[in-house]
Amino acid sequence: MAKKKKTRKELLKEPDEFITFTGKAIAFVTEYQKQISYILCAIVAFALIFFGYRFFAQRAETKAFTRLAQTQSKYDTLKKTSSGTAAYNQVSEAFQSIIKKYGGNAGGKLARVIYANISFDAQKYEEAIVLYKQALSDFKDDKFVYNLIISNLGYAYQRVGDEQNAAAYFEKATSSTNSSIREEALFNLGLIYENLGKDEKGQQTFQEILKNHPDSIYFDVVEEELNKLKK
C-alpha cells in the first residue's frame, strides 16, 4: 500500500528538527554558561602559558648563546697575549654565571663543556673532571660529543695521576663508532696498561690498532712500541 502523503497542515504542526536542536543547544549553553566559560578560559590560559613558555625559552636560549659567544671570544683574544691560566682567570666568573643561569638550556650545556676544556687548559684538572662529569648527562643522546667528553675525562685523570680511572674512561671511549676517538683511546689505553705493568693487555690493545686501524696516525708508533716490547 502506498504511504499516505502528509498534508501541508500536518507538516506545519511538526517541529523543525534543526530549530529543535538549536533550541536545545541554546538551553544547554544558558544552563551551563558558567561552566563553559571556565573551560574556555582554561583552554585560553593553557594556550597562553604554552606559547609564552616557548617564547621565553627561545629568548633565554638566544641570550645564553649570545653570552657564550661573547665570553668565548674574550677568552680566545686573551689566549693570544697571555697564558691559559691568565685567560681562565679573566673569564671564569662569566662562564659560571652562564652555567648557573642557563644550565638547562642548550647554550648553558655547551658552556659547561667549553668551560671544562678551558679549566683543563689552565691545569685546573679537578675542576675539569667535575664539569665533564656533569656534562655527560647533557649529551647522553649525542654519542660523538658524549665520547669526546669520556675521552677528555681519561686525559684529566691522567693529569692528576689517577691511571686506574684514566684507563676506565679510555676503555669506555674505545666503544666509540668514531674512528679517531677510538684510535686515540686505544693508544692511550695501551700506554696506561704498560705503566700499570699490564704488558700483555697493553700489547693486545696496540695490536687492535694495527689490525683494525691500518690508516691510523698511531700505526707507526704502535708498531715500533710492539717491536721494542718483543725484544
Feature map (PLM): residue ranges:
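N-terminal positive-inside, membrane-proximal cytosolic segments immediately preceding the first
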Residues: A2-A42
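Short solvent-exposed coil/turn linkers within tandem alpha-helical repeat scaffolds
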Residues: I99-G108, A122, S137-Y146, A173-R182, ...
